[in-house]
Each structure stands twice: as structure tokens, then as C-alpha cells.
Amino acid sequence: MSAWLLPAGGFPGAGFCIPAWQSRSSLSRVLRWPGPGLPGLLLLLLLPSPSAFSAVFKVGVLGPWACDPIFARARPDLAARLATDRLNRDLALDGGPWFEVTLLPEPCLTPGSLGAVSSALTRVSGLVGPVNPAACRPAELLAQEAGVALVPWGCPGTRAAGTTAPAVTPAADALYVLLKAFRWARVALITAPQDLWVEAGRALSTALRARGLPVALVTSMVPSDLSGAREALRRIRDGPRVRVVIMVMHSVLLGGEEQRYLLEAAEELGLTDGSLVFLPFDTLHYALSPGPEALAAFVNSSKLRRAHDAVLTLTRRCPPGGSVQDSLRRAQEHQELPLDLDLKQVSPLFGTIYDAVFLLAGGVTRARAAVGGGWVSGASVARQMREAQVFGFCGILGRTEEPSFVLLDTDAAGERLFTTHLLDPVLGSLRSAGTPVHFPRGAPAPGPDPSCWFDPDVICNGGVEPGLVFVGFLLVIVVGLTGAFLAHYLRHRLLHMQMVSGPNKIILTLEDVTFLHPQGGSSRKVAQGSRSSLATRSTSDIRSVPSQPQESTNIGLYEGDWVWLKKFPGEHHMAIRPATKMAFSKLRELRHENVALYLGLFLAGTADSPATPGEGILAVVSEHCARGSLHDLLAQRDIKLDWMFKSSLLLDLIKGMRYLHHRGVAHGRLKSRNCVVDGRFVLKVTDHGHGRLLEAQRVLPEPPSAEDQLWTAPELLRDPALERRGTLAGDVFSLGIIMQEVVCRSTPYAMLELTPEEVIQRVRSPPPLCRPLVSMDQAPMECIQLMAQCWAEHPELRPSMDLTFDLFKGINKGRKTNIIDSMLRMLEQYSSNLEDLIRERTEELEQEKQKTDRLLTQMLPPSVAEALKMGTSVEPEYFEEVTLYFSDIVGFTTISAMSEPIEVVDLLNDLYTLFDAIIGSHDVYKVETIGDAYMVASGLPQRNGQRHAAEIANMSLDILSAVGSFRMRHMPEVPVRIRIGLHSGPCVAGVVGLTMPRYCLFGDTVNTASRMESTGLPYRIHVNMSTVRILRALDQGFQMECRGRTELKGKGVEDTYWLVGRVGFNKPIPKPPDLQPGASNHGISLQEIPPERRKKLEKARPGQFTGK
């Protein structure tokens, strides 16, 4: 009789599945028949297997057994078989189904894992798995649809629902209880790069965030080696601060290489000093036993042992004496496991798989019992599993009062694991086991985070306690009110201190200001003098005087900047009154581009009497503008002012006055002399508020002259008191007069041909109205109309400064009146000439450069010259074989004695010019000339193989032929004879010296060539054997005669030759003179010297008529 296979949806009815006489109870009675007799044994052998009489419940165990060797070490086949064998032998399950197990492989890649789940659910009645968290939620839905009980032991955040019943408490719940107990809210996750661990990290971070914890970072180790670990830890170190790092990967205690690399990298980066706690994730799925056996991976690595001191291990709890290894040992002793199985190589995950299968079976049994043995659904099985209490591999599964997790830590030596705390995720409690946690280096636990992160009823804003926020808010209010009071007090106090001391003080003395005055000349007084430009004085006319100020100057230096001093009337000022200080402080705060900056009040003694109490000079110190006043600028006729230039100046003036009027300051003394221009041609208003300062200081102003009142409004002329204070409308009138000055470039009212006194009288007492006359061609019509509005008789008819600003801007149709643009337009007419001039100068420079290059290449080889021009060093160069030429004029000493110095220079210049023309047609390099000696080389600086000997030989023949017809200009009857010496060999060439560098040759070849010349004869080419060999090898028809044995100084006796010609050489060669026996080859005979020259020679060298 065959067994019935239960469908995936549950069990059929008892009557259909298990007949009464075939139940497990009857089978048990049959198996318990007494007597060991042979009939009984035969009957036992003939009985069918129990599964033949029971319904079969197939359990699928899904996991990455084929693609992950560490998961494979859990031996899921043996674990599931051991569980089903014990279930099938359990008499307490009498009448229940027969359990069979199927091991199902789960791919390590997420897409394959989903496919494996879908396939498994069609083949089994209950499924243990999957392990990949990405497949957990789809597995729950598919299992619910298929009615299959699901035990997903690898999903960190899965809750019991529907047909799903986790074998143990979800990892996220256990972790949350631990983090809450220590108040570690800020965590980071590092995952292995495999899909399974990446998805586990995502699922765990989602579960922790759902519980309100701020997961700062989830990162992977890519690559999965030491470098990837360092990079992942650097991201955590450089990111938001965290307390805990959860390592989502195989534990190093089970051989996980990624976690080994991670801990070693943390030790290298100094992150295992107690500032971070490292929590392994995979130990939450199995029971890791305390003791020294668990740390076998650290035996040969002290570095890893030190790093693991920062690790806290949260794992499932086994009762004392009931660890996974103890249970494996007992099962092997009872022959339930193969005897050859190495238990040390079995992963603790063995017990987790065993428990999942066992728990599933307990749920099936309770579900069938609840319905009387009939059909049950997957949801019923899952519900019974959640309420079941069965004996697992190392303890009781299901509802129990004992804590299900323990917290393990290493001792100080890192030699064993010990239990520090017991954790109950159901009650959310963590109680001490008697041994405290040992943090690295004896440090305390990482600082706790705010408790609001763990309170679901409180919104935690960045980890700040609400109470602290409220207290902080009150503190801010109190501090704000106190600060406002202190600020008000300190402002007045600092203002007073700034007036008398500090870098921003406004009371200046002789120690602060250095004055300048002309030497021996006169200048205008401080108060009445016009503002002259400092640029008009030469540096030889000014000097620094670190003493009392002279009355003849109003320019000084303050903190390195030029300043201008405006003197108060009088010279006996006792002190600066407080009202003056306050008034000046307000004026000093005025900051605008078109308003001169006030720097301080100067108080010192006079020039004649030292500074004494009650006597001194008081002046306003303001910034100095280099181009002087507007009055001075208009008077300089060499400065051309077009309309754009004028409108730019006027617009600056209007903007400055507009700023002052917005601040409630009436100038009262506005005139072109109180408008200054800086180096950028920006106009600035100065002397503003001067009347206020005089009034505050209680100083009576000096009566103004008629010339100073030309800018004053008529209503102010009629009221002196009002004139001293000034009005806004009066400033508008003064502005109109300044506009007339700028437009006409003349003094006020200049076109009326009246004296200042007459003008003031007519303006003060109309009618008729006395106003300037401006021609229509001097300015736009709008500008003339604006001037007329500004100098209206009635103040209320004059426009405000704001309206004046708008009207003046409309004159230029909105175009910007920038002086720089105006100056650029003025310079455009010179641009073409400037370009032509630059081009001409560039061509001249290029020509001079070419001349310099030609001169340099005449003095040095081109390659050497280029190197020197580029600034690079010229290294000495060795040449294996070159040919050198030396020549000398026979009797040059005698010729020099018979000639004037200028005649000797002409002789050498003519001769060497001839030589230079000849060497230009040969591949040779002229090395140098020393007196009458001429040195040429071939084969350097450019190598030419062995042609150097032929080039020098041909050149020597050409030179000898040319010398035969050469005559001196001052002694044409005296022949010029030369001796020539040739030699070939190696040498070194290089540039010698820094001043007038020369390209020089060094080596024995140079000496030998010189000896060949000195031992030669007139009109002869003396050739060494080394050159002869090369010429013969070239076979170009050179004709040579053997001279015989010749003694060379320093070289001994050698065979030498005369070069007498070459086949095809048709130029005449002079005949060598016949030498008398004993005669020298270095002189000129007496008969060849003209009589008149001979007398000169006899006087110069008495008794000698030949010589060199």
C-alpha cells in the first residue's frame, strides 16, 4: 500500500487519510509485541513502513546551500533529516502525518531567489525559508495564496501574519531592544557585496527606521577585501556621527573573510578605541555558545583579537549544558548523525534549521488536533506555530518565560566569550548576567543618544530632547534680553572708547598723523587753502616731519593713507566737547562712494608754542583725493572734458548729495571747492556737516568772503543764521551753480562780467534776478532747464535731490555716464597709431634679434648657441675622430716690427676675411684665431663620418692657393707665407667660461696638430700619418709626398707627409722657398725686406734681421 501525499493546501479528512486500523497507535501496538522469537522478527520484516499507512507532509528547506560554503557548513540535509527522524519516531505524534524533508537550493542572486521560492511552494506543504530578505515579502504573499505554512528564519523584520510564522524573534526586534537598552540610536550598516547580504542590510535598515531609529548610512564593502573595508569605514567615519556599526555579513567566528577584513581595517583606522560598537548581524539567527572554543579563529591573529574587543555579539540563548555542540555530540553518540562527521566543522546554524522544521511539525500536530484530525490550512498551522511550545535543538521553542537571546563579549585578553546580559525581545528587557561589558581599553560605553528616539509618542528632531528644547528656548530669550541690554550699554561705552583709544579712535594727535610740508616754500593756510593735488608735488619737495604740524600744510599720513585736514577757526581750542564728538560720530558713519570719508578729529599744539593745556589746533581729518577739488580740475586746461566726462562728474555729485539728504544732512557749504576727485575720477562731496561741528564746538565761523558766497542761495544770503546751518533747498541751488561751472568750465557768474560783491548784492536783493547765462550749444537743453529749476528764487519751486537725480539721468536717455567709458572713447582715436607703432617696434625688435642671433652663431656653433638661448647647460661632448687645421704666418713677428699697429690689424683682417670666405664652401668649423694663428676643425660640432679629413685637405689647398697671390696693403713687395699643419684624432669640445664663453677643443689631437704646424715649412701642408690613412681610405686622389722622419715635440720621431695636390685640383699653388742649410723656417730673409722697413727693424731689434 502506497502513502498519500498531502497537497500544498493542507490535509484531507481523517477517514480519507489514515484508517483507524492503520493508525500510529495500532502500529505501535504491533511493534510492541513481546518475544524476540523468530516468528516475531519475520512478522516485523514483513510489515510495511509506517509511511505506507500515514499521510505524508513534505517540508521544504530552502537556502543558499550550493552557492555559499559557510551556509553549506550548517549541513541542512543532516539537520532536517534529524528533525524529521525524531518527529516520525515521536509517539506523541501518534496519528499525525509522516514528515518528509526536501532540500531546495536557493540561488545567491536575488532574481534567482524569487524563482526558487515560487517553484518550492508548488512542491511542498510547508516551507522553511527563504534566506534572501528580498524574497521574504513575495514569499509571504505566494505562501498565503497557496495556503502553505512558511517559516522565514532569515528575514530580519518579518512579522507573524497569515501563513507566516518566524521560527525565532525577528532580528530587528532583538537589535532594537539592545539599542534601546544602551540608548544607541545612531547606527550604520556595512554589508558584504553579495546580493543576500545587501538585501539583508536594506531590510534591516528599513525595519530599524520603521521603529524610529536614524540609520545614518548603509554601505557595502566593494571590493570585498581590505581596501573595500577601509573605504566603507572611511565613509562612516567622515559621515554623520554614529554609535553602532552593524556588520551584515558572515561572522568571522564562522570563517567570514569580509568581517575579518572589516575588523582589521577598523583596527588600522583607530575605530576600535571604544568610540564605536560593532554588532554582527548573522549571530542573531543561531545560538553561539560562550567559552574559548568560539574564538578559535583568533588563535593566530593578535590584531584580530584586539579588534574583536570592540564587538558585542547578540545571539540566541541555549540553556546551560544544552549548546549546539553539546546537542550535536549527544546526537552522534546516539548514532543519529554519522560517526565520521567532524562536529567542529558544523555551523551553529544547524540548530536553527532543526528548530524551524521541528516548530513547523509542532504547528501541524496542534492544528490537526484542534480540528479533530481533519483538514487544516496553512494559516491554521502558522497560528498554532506561534502558540506552540516544543523542545528545540538546544532549548524550548515558542512561548517561554526565559530570555531567548544573550549578549556575549570578550574578556580583556580576548581569549574567551562570556555572557554579560540576557535579552527578552518579547518583554523588551535586557538584564545583566552578572558580568559587565568590557569596552576597549577600559573606556566607558559610547555616549547615549536622546531617549526620544525610542519613544514612539514623541517626535525626535535631530535627537534633541523636547525638554532641552524648551529650556534652550527660555535660555535664548533670557540671553537675548540680557544681550540687548548689554549691547545697548556696550555700544555707548565702546563709542566713547573708540573716540579716545583703539585702532578706530576718532581723537587723533601728533603720534597718529605725520605731516608733509614743502621745503623752503610757502603754501596756503589749512582753513582757506584750496585742495591741491598731492600728485602735483614731486617727491623731492615733500618730507615727513614727526613733530608739530606746520600751518603751511594740510596734507598728512594716517595709518599709511594720505589724509586731508580741515582746520577749525582759531588756534586755542581747549578740548573737544562731547557734543562735537557725538555729532562727528554720526558724520563718521556716513559711508557712500560719492561722499568723502571722515576719519577723525585732530587736536594738537601750534607750530610756535608747544601743545599746552588750553591751546591747540583742531581740524577734521578726512580722506585725501589725489586729483584735488573739482575747482582745480576745471582749471586744468590740459584735461579735455567732453559731455560724457562732465555728466559723469555731475551725476556723482548728485548721488552724493542725494545720499546726504536721505540721511537728513544739509551741506550748507556746497561749492566746487568742496567737491574732490580721486585717482579714478570719482567725485566725492566733502566738508558736509561742518556747520554742525562748529556749532557743537561753539566756534564762531569766520565771515565768508563774497567769492565764497557765489554758490549760496538767496534766502541764505538774507539770513546769516540760516546760512550757517544750511538747508536742503539751499544745497539744490548750490548744485545748480556747480552745474554751470562744469558745463561752461568757468567760475560762477563769469559770463556776467561782474565782481563777486556785485553778484552777491544782486542775488540777495532782486529784482532783477541775477543768474548765470548758459549758451544752448554748451549743454543739452534738458540740462540747462534743470539748472534753471535748481536756482529758482523760491525754495519750494526747486526740485528735490531725488527728482534732480531722475531728471539728470533722463538727459542721457538712460545711458551710463561712466568716466572710464568716456576715457576709452577718447583713447580710440589713438588706437590705430598705437597699433602701427607697436608693429613698427616689433619689426625693429625682430631685426635686432636676428642680428644678435647671427652674431651669436658666428661666435658659437648653432646648436650650442640655441642651447644657451634656451638657458640649458651645454655639456662637454666627446668626438671619436676629427681633423684639425693649424696655420701660422711665417715671419709675423718681423712683419709686425716693420708695421704700425693699425697696419697689422689691416693685414690680419684682410687675410682672415680671405680665409673665412674659403671655409664657407667647406664642411668645417672655425674654432678661433689667436694673433696670426688660425684654427679650423671638421667633424665637429656636427659629425660627418670620415669626410672631415677630405674637407680639411681641400680647404688647405684652397687657402694655400689663395695665399700665393695675397699681398699686404702696406708692404705689397713682401710675400705672405703660411705654414699649415693637419692631424686627425679624438678630442673633447665644450663651452668654457661664463664671461664671453668660447667653444674650445681639448685633447692630445690639438697639441699634435699644433706641432705639425710648427714643424712645417712655408707654403707647405704638413700632414700626420693619421690623416694620411683616412685620405687614402677615402681614395679621392689626394697627392702626398713623404717628408721622412720628423721629430715632434713631446711625441718623438714620426713619419710625416706633404700634401701637394689632388687629382683635378687646377688652382696654382705657390712654390715653397729654398731654405739654406741651417736657416730657420720661421723667418723672412733680409733681401725680402724693403730698405726703409729694414732700418726700422734694425732700430727695433739691433743685430737681428729674422725672427718670428
Swiss-Prot record:
A molecular function (GO) term: identical protein binding
Membrane topology summary: Single-pass type I membrane protein
Keyword Glycoprotein carried by entry: yes
Region feature Disordered, mapped onto this chain: 520-552, 1069-1108
CDD domains: CHD, PBP1_sensory_GC_DEF-like, PK_GC-2D
Signal peptide: 1-54
Localization annotation: Membrane; Photoreceptor outer segment membrane; Endoplasmic reticulum membrane
SUPFAM superfamilies per UniProt: Nucleotide cyclase, Periplasmic binding protein-like I, Protein kinase-like (PK-like)
Protein name: Retinal guanylyl cyclase 1
Organism this protein belongs to: Rattus norvegicus
The encoding gene: Gucy2e
